[in-house]
Swiss-Prot record:
Similarity comment: family membership: Belongs to the Cu-Zn superoxide dismutase family.
Subcellular location: Cytoplasm
Subunit details: Homodimer.
Keyword Transmembrane (UniProt): no
The protein's Enzyme Commission number: 1.15.1.1
Protein name: Superoxide dismutase [Cu-Zn]
Species of the source: Hordeum vulgare
Keyword Zinc: yes
Cofactor: Cu cation; Zn(2+)
Length: 22
């Protein structure tokens, strides 16, 4: 799940990194 969220928000970059850490 986390990975999926990181990829989806990867467009923003910053949000993707934060979600990936969570």
């Amino acid at each position: 799940m986390x990975k999926a969220v990181a990829v989806l928000t990867g467009s923003e970059g910053v949000x993707g990194t934060i979600f990936f850490t969570q």
